[in-house]
Amino acid sequence: MKETDIAGILTSTHTIALVGASDKPDRPSYRVMKYLLDQGYHVIPVSPKVAGKTLLGQKGYGTLADVPEKVDMVDVFRNSEAAWGVAQEAIAIGAKTLWMQLGVINEQAAVLARDAGLNVVMDRCPAIEIPRLGLAK
């Protein structure tokens, strides 16, 4: 994927469902969620562990299907094997982008999502890409 494509995704995205969210401040998903919130994104934590709880001021949900609002991007903080199921859920809720974090690599999930019309970013972190592309606020 070209850098201009990634920049376009990041500038057109408003609502991000962060799948695999953790309420532990030392976890990468917590730190990235905080960064994305600080950048002005609306971030929805998704994980059975945060369902019904508030994380960084945002209500948590157990699954993507439980999220009651439109999601632009699904950011995957799960292992590579779990990405296939998350891709299926992202398609089902009508997300525009499936973003698999650093170390999350699943070509089958990427093909599935692309074939369904989603943008796919794999093995990258938005908290790294935003400042690298000069998009930080």
Swiss-Prot record:
Pfam families documented for this protein: CoA_binding_2
Any single GO CC term annotated in Swiss-Prot or TrEMBL for this entry: cytoplasm
Protein name: Uncharacterized protein YccU
Organism: Escherichia coli (strain K12)
